[in-house]
């Protein structure tokens, strides 16, 4: 039997959380180093898996590093893990951000033990979603994620943290209830929870209990809440605004990607003909999300809230790539998820650092901080320009591939029109990003901020590591797209694109 990479990657953070939970109070330094250890190991293992991943043509559509053990025989449910070209980049991204948020949290002093327990449990739950090949196991990991995110926002957040955390839970549970109904409908119709077996055969066997269209939309709405898609988006700005910085980075960087991943893996894989039939409607929602998110962003005065609404717009690009339904657009959507995770994760990290060092988040009161915080200003500018699609950054590569694929789609009537409308969102994005950078870091220097400190050595390490990855993917996107295509090609074949 081969080495169980995925079990170790998924559960090492949980092991770390359990060990930290057993500690008594007052050992903050040791707790931090343990958190580094138990997030570094999954990252190392995920990079090893990435390096030995079979990229040959024969591996197209093949789940690699599979582990399968009978779990609940009465339901034909299994502990079944595996990754393909779609999920492996998401695993590496989550493991990387898991380590980054530990460094971001280095100066956290409130209930440190509980804080890192929840942070590590959050990482395990997200990794579990991206590696599960059994729908029940997938759902369990999906639900577990709610608990640590709730506590991270409600205890270590700011502002209306209790309201935002409860709103997050209610929205997520609403989506989860619909998703569970869809999963149970699939199970009672097919007798299997195996995502590999269902992919490609779903429409042939999903007919008797309820219409396939109904199951498709039950699952789709559950995923759309998490992505989020307008009109299911209103929890996101509140959660981001009031979450601690580490929570915002994981939320934007990895957690909302679960929604896009679920749509591609489950909705498109099992219901390709339904996806084709309703693609124009869903592309309309994508364009609405892009334009609405960008337009509302222009009116924000809170630093983190502005970045949160930009995420709504960028997830619209993901939805556009998904429901253009061809191989290029789907590859672009998957790359956009990774790119957005790096870029917006970095934006939230820099926003949190700015708010922490300056003590102010109102954009009307900020300005001229580039003199006091040159490193933060440079990194924030790179992340911001990457978000609007600056060449040599991951944002440009992801948006270009997504738009090229969507514009050339022959499966969806009016795809070029939807694409052109979505490109308007990039123009609006340039407006709010450039205004944000100018407002926070340039303009008149304010005397009250003369004593503000720049990023310290540890902060510069993770800042520039993220910048390096953003530039690497931007200059050489094939490092990811060559793998992503192996997972996307079979889906595109099912869809006819």
Where are the model-predicted features located?
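Cytoplasmic/organellar membrane-interface segments at the starts of transmembrane helices
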Residues: 373-375, 433-497
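Central hydrophobic cores of alpha-helical transmembrane segments in multi-pass inner-membrane proteins
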Residues: 7-22, 36-49, 93-105, 122-124, ...
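Transmembrane helix-loop-helix hairpins at membrane boundaries of multipass inner-membrane proteins
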Residues: 1-5, 19-103, 107-117, 192, ...
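Short hydrophobic alpha-helical membrane-embedded segments
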Residues: 9-12, 92, 113-122, 308-312
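Cytoplasmic juxtamembrane regions at transmembrane-helix boundaries
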Residues: 103-118, 245, 253, 442, ...
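Hydrophobic transmembrane alpha-helices and their helix-loop junctions in integral membrane proteins
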Residues: 100-106, 124-136, 149-438
């Amino acid at each position: 039997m081969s080495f169980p990479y995925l079990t170790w990657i998924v559960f090492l953070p949980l092991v770390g959380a359990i060990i930290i939970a057993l500690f008594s109070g007052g050992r903050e330094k040791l707790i931090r180093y343990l958190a580094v250890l138990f997030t570094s190991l999954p990252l190392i293992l995920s990079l090893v898996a990435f390096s030995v991943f079979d990229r040959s043509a024969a591996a197209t559509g093949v789940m690699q590093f599979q582990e399968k053990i009978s779990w609940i025989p009465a339901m034909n449910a299994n502990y079944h893990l595996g990754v393909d070209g779609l999920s492996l980049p998401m695993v590496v991204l989550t493991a990387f951000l898991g380590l980054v948020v530990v460094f971001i949290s280095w100066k956290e002093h409130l209930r440190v033990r509980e804080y890192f327990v929840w942070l590590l449990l959050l990482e395990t739950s997200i990794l579990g979603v991206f590696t599960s090949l059994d729908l029940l196991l997938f759902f369990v990991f999906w639900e577990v994620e709610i608990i640590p995110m709730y506590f991270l926002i409600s205890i270590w957040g700011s502002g209306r943290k209790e309201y935002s955390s409860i709103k997050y839970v209610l929205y997520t549970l609403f989506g989860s209830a619909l998703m569970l109904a869809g999963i149970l409908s699939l199970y009672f119709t097919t007798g299997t929870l195996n995502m590999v077996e269902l992919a490609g055969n779903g429409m042939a066997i999903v007919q008797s209990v309820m219409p396939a269209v109904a199951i498709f939309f039950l699952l789709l709405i559950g995923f759309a809440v998490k992505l989020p898609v307008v009109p299911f988006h209103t929890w996101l700005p509140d959660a981001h605004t009031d979450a601690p910085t580490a929570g915002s980075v994981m939320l934007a960087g990895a957690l909302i990607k679960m929604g896009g991943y679920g749509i591609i893996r489950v909705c498109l894989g099992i219901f390709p003909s339904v996806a084709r039939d309703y693609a124009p409607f869903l592309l309309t929602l994508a364009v609405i999300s892009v334009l609405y998110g960008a337009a509302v962003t222009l009116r924000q005065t809170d630093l983190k809230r502005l970045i949160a609404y930009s995420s709504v717009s960028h997830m619209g690009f993901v939805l556009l790539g998904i429901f253009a339904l061809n191989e290029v657009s789907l590859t672009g959507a998957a790359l956009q998820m990774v790119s957005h995770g790096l870029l917006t994760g970095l934006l939230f990290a820099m926003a949190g650092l700015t708010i922490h060092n300056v003590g102010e988040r109102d954009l009307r009161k900020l300005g001229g901080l580039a003199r006091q915080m040159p490193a933060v200003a440079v990194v924030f500018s790179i992340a911001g320009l990457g978000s609007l699609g600056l060449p040599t950054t991951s944002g440009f590569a992801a948006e270009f591939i997504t738009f090229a694929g969507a514009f050339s789609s022959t499966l969806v009537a009016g795809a070029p029109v939807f694409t052109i409308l979505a490109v308007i969102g990039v123009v609006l994005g340039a407006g709010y990003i450039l205004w944000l950078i100018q407002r926070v870091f340039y303009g008149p220097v304010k005397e009250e901020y003369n004593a503000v400190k720049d990023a310290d050595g540890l902060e510069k390490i993770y800042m520039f590591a993220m910048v390096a990855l953003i530039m690497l993917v931007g200059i050489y996107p094939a490092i990811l797209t060559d793998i992503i295509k192996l997972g996307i090609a079979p889906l595109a074949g099912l869809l006819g694109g």
